[in-house]
Design a protein with these regions (language model features):
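Catalytic phosphate/metal-binding cores of nucleic-acid and nucleotide-processing enzymes, i.e., regions
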Residues: 1-108
Length: 108
């Protein structure tokens, strides 16, 4: 699998990453938010496309970040009928902003 960082940005103090994954002839996008380990988050209560499918202290590939005080939550756009035409870099970025908004508003 090949992974390419397509976009990184900071939204309200949270680093966000949009990544394209290539597996053979298929490709799909994922989005990740870097979160402080001190911030309690119930990932099951975050409303995003397909739900949170990644929650790990390791930065997702291809990111090379080694920060013991951070962890990462994310979602993927590899569900039935998902396409890269629909799940553009911009749409994934908007979904990441919504996740951050939920974290900040306490909807977690």
């Amino acid at each position: 699998m090949t992974s390419i960082l397509e976009r990184s940005f900071n939204f309200n103090g949270f680093n966000c990453y949009g990544i394209m994954r290539h597996m053979g002839d298929n490709c799909y996008r994922c989005g990740y938010v870097q979160v402080s380990k001190r911030l309690p988050i119930n990932t099951a209560s975050i409303n995003c496309h397909g739900g949170i499918t990644y929650a790990n202290k390791e930065a997702p590939s291809p990111l090379e970040i080694d920060d013991k005080n951070k962890w990462y939550i994310g979602f993927d756009c590899a569900h039935a009928f998902d396409t890269t035409d629909f799940w553009t870099v911009s749409r994934v970025s908007n979904e990441l902003r919504q996740i951050v908004g939920q974290i900040l508003s306490g909807e977690r």
